[in-house]
């Protein structure tokens, strides 16, 4: 194994560790709140339900930073491919946090942070689309899934910086991961439509 791949591997492990630190559960504990209430998800939306909007926004911003900082540092210190690996590892750490026995958050805000580091203009556009949909529908999960779909389209069709193939795979993987983490929301929506 070449030295460069060892560095990439170590950076990915560090990214996974940073991603696995869950601000939602830390803040909930300091506020003596139980995140098993609400949706039960250890993420910003549920913190907003349990502790109020202010704390939900704080957790959301911390999750965005958690995705942005490791990915941006990897881009700054190494290269775009390393940034993709670290960004994906950070999101995986968030959704599969060993500190939460593999039951982490849904990865939306952390993914946004990672995307902001490598595709900043697209990330801002995606955030606008998410915000408009949320304003119209008041449905966080649906707005998140629409943003994930937009990311998959962008990754698949847009002209990306080199390495192009890695960027396409990365974007589609992030979009799929967020979609899979929303399987319960998709199932609940489908049942409501059928009834």
Whereabouts are the PLM-identified features?
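N-terminal signal-anchor transmembrane alpha helix
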Residues: 2-30
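Cytosolic, membrane-interface loops and tails of multi-pass inner-membrane proteins
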Residues: 24-56, 104, 187-195
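Loop-to-transmembrane alpha-helix initiation sites
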Residues: 122-126, 140-148, 162-174
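Interfacial segments of multi-pass membrane proteins
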Residues: 48-51, 74-78, 93, 108-137, ...
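Nucleotide and nucleotide-moiety/phosphate-recognizing core
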Residues: 7, 11, 55-98, 130-131, ...
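C-terminal ends of transmembrane helices
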Residues: 24-29, 92-103, 129-137, 182-189
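C-terminal membrane-associated helical module and adjoining short loops/tails
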Residues: 164-195
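Short, non-helical or kinked segments that cap or interrupt transmembrane helices
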Residues: 34-43, 99-112, 139-150
